[in-house]
Every structure is written in structure tokens, then in C-alpha cells.
């Protein structure tokens, strides 16, 4: 069981590093740069489902929600604003950010946006739960 969990987490980390590395090194900007970082705590225990997807959101879209597992995001195009307990940040093309599991936050799409998203979800966990 621990070996399977370690393999899943290593795979997820490899995907995140690959996506971020590709964006940093493969973009129009030939200068390598840090695109985002943070402290990831509270990894899911046991096996996780690793889900990679592309999300397209229209300008003006808003949502206050939580995720069932850590969620890693790279902005492909457009601009989004994320507001949570730590403040408000604006992200644009090439930027990377993550959302810890269970942390309430709000996304506001400033211009039509396309995000590459990787989620680590414990079995049965909801990707996203809307909050009022």
C-alpha cells in the first residue's frame, strides 16, 4: 500500500515538474524563471487518483469553493485572480499555483482563461465543492 502511494505521489510530482518545466523552458520567454511556489502540507493518506485536465473558463466567471485534494494549476492563457485566507493573487500565462485540499478560495476570471490542472484525489473525494 505504501509503495503504491509513493509511486502515485512520485508520478504526480513528476507530472507537475514536467508541466511547469515545459512552460518555463518551452515558452516564448527564453529566460528561465520561477513561476510560482508554496508549501504543500497534508498530502492525502493512502492511494490517490491523479487526474490531469484542461479547464477553460470565460471572462467574468467566479466561484468560491474547496477541492477534495491538492490541486496544481498552470495558466496557459488568460488571467485569473485567486483570493484565499492568505490574500489575493493574480496569475497569467506561464504562472503556476496550487490550492491545498479543503482551503476555501475564490477564483475570478479576469480574461478568458485556459488552465492545465493536476489533482490528487483520495478515492471518493469530490474534485470541487461549491461554497456559498
Locations of regions flagged by a protein language model:
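A short glycine-rich, His/Asp/Glu-containing loop-to-beta-strand
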Residues: 29-64, 113, 118-121
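All-alpha RGS (Regulator of G-protein Signaling) helical domain and cognate RGS-like helical scaffolds
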Residues: 30-35, 91-92, 96-97, 121, ...
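Conserved short histidine dyad/triad with adjacent acidic residue
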Residues: 50-67, 88-92, 98-102
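Ligand-binding loop in jelly-roll beta-barrel domains
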Residues: 101-126
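Positively charged n-region of N-terminal signal peptides that target proteins for export
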Residues: 1-4
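Glycine- and acidic-residue-biased ligand/ion/polar-headgroup-sensing regions
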Residues: 68-85
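Hydrophobic membrane-insertion alpha-helices, especially the h-region
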Residues: 6-19
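C-terminal region of N-terminal signal peptides and the immediate post-cleavage residues
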Residues: 16-33
